[in-house]
Curated annotation (Swiss-Prot):
The modification Pyrrolidone carboxylic acid is found at residue 23. It is found in: Secreted. The lineage of its organism: Eukaryota, Metazoa, Chordata, Craniata, Vertebrata. It holds the Pfam family RnaseA. One of its GO terms (cellular component) is extracellular region. Cleavage between Arg-55 and Arg-56 is catalyzed by a membrane-localized Gram-negative bacterium protease (OmpT in E.coli). The excised fragment is then transported to the bacterium cytosol for cleavage of the disulfide bridge linking Cys-48 and Cys-109, thus separating the N-terminal and LF-ZF3. LF-ZF3 but not the N-terminal peptide possesses bactericidal activity. It is an enzyme of class 3 (hydrolase). The record marks 55 as: Cleavage. It comes from the Eukaryota. Residues 1-22 form the signal peptide. The keyword Hydrolase applies. This is Ribonuclease-like 3. Keywords: Angiogenesis, Antibiotic, Antimicrobial, Developmental protein, Differentiation, Disulfide bond, Endonuclease, Hydrolase, Immunity, Nuclease, Pyrrolidone carboxylic acid, Secreted, Signal.
Length: 149
């Protein structure tokens, strides 16, 4: 195999290892999990039950135990992603955490009854707060907390 063919094969493998989002597959998986767990522009206080059930959000990813509390950011993924691409401030105590410069509307779904999916019942509460997320490169992969200002 010639040098040009080797180079082409290496470039092809490199491209195949990157997702359509432009990040490595493992970061893509964590980003997509973050979106499923914490980002939904259409959620309201009244729809916590349905959204938690449809997205199968449980205490542990492979279990059926109801999750006690889950926070949804009422926005789209691109808007939330701006926290990692210049719209957030790096936290001094953890270099991977960024606080949004602007507030987001969030819906906090708190378990009110039930123990196991799909019998979990939630109460939703809307608030406005800055969000703190972990970023891997330009991609949010973990919701840390919301901060009321």
């Amino acid at each position: 195999m010639g040098i040009h063919q080797c180079t082409a094969v290496v470039l092809l493998l490199l491209c195949a290892s990157l997702s359509t989002y432009g990040q490595p597959a493992e970061i893509r998986r964590r980003y997509e999990h973050f979106l499923t767990q914490h980002v939904y522009g259409g959620i309201t206080e009244q729809t916590c039950d349905r959204v938690m059930r449809q997205r199968r959000i449980t205490r542990f990813p492979t279990g059926n135990d109801c999750k006690e509390v889950n926070t949804f950011i009422q926005a789209n993924g691109n808007h939330v992603r701006t926290v990692c691409t210049g719209g957030g401030t790096r936290q001094t105590d953890n270099r991977d955490l960024y606080m949004s410069n602007n507030q987001f509307t969030v819906i906090t779904c708190t378990l009110r009854s039930g123990e196991r999916h799909p019998n979990c019942r939630y109460r939703g509460k809307e608030s406005s707060r800055k969000i703190v997320v972990a970023c891997e490169g330009e991609w949010p992969t973990h919701y840390e907390k919301g901060v009321i200002v």
